[in-house]
A protein has these predicted regions:
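Long, low-complexity N-terminal extensions
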Residues: 1-123
Length: 123
C-alpha cells in the first residue's frame, strides 16, 4: 500500500472516532513511487500534516521540535541522519519524564529499512 493511501485511510479512521478518539499521534513515513520521502503526522482526530523535512510526535514534542530545527538539514546521508535522529531523541526524552526509556529509530532508504534501538535513562 502506498504511504499516501495509508495516511488517508488512517486519517479517515481516526476522524470517524472523533467523539471517542484513540489517544494516538500517528506518524506515517515511506517512499513515494518516484523514490522521494513521504512524511505525514496526525493528531488524535486524524487531521494530517504533510511535510518535506521532519515530523515529531508525542509528549516531548516541544523539545524534539527545537532539537530537530537546530540539527536537521536537507540531503543527509543515512548514517548522518541516524546519528542526528538519535541525538535529538535522547536529548529530548532526557527532559521529559513521560517519554520512556529509549526509542527505536527506523531509517528508510530505497535500498531498505534500517532499524536500531536506543537506550535512554532508566531512572
Amino acid at each position: 500500500m502506498k504511504p499516501e493511501a495509508f495516511s488517508a485511510l488512517l486519517s479517515h479512521m481516526l476522524y470517524e472516532k472523533r467523539f471517542g478518539p484513540y489517544f494516538v499521534e500517528p506518524v506515517v513515513c515511506g517512499l513515494k513511487d518516484d523514490g522521494s520521502p513521504f512524511l505525514c503526522g496526525m493528531d488524535l482526530i486524524g487531521a494530517p500534516v504533510y511535510t518535506d523535512d521532519y515530523v515529531v510526535s508525542g509528549t516531548c514534542t516541544p523539545n524534539l521540535n527545537g532539537m530537530c530545527e537546530s540539527m536537521w538539514r536537507p540531503d543527509m546521508a543515512p548514517d548522518e541522519l541516524f546519528e542526528t535522529i538519535s541525538q535529538c531523541l535522547l536529548a529530548s526524552v532526557d527532559r521529559d519524564a513521560l517519554s520512556g526509556w529509549g526509542a527505536v529509530v527506523h531509517v528508510i532508504t530505497p535500498q531498505g529499512i534500517t532499524s536500531k534501538s536506543l537506550k535512554g535513562r532508566m531512572d
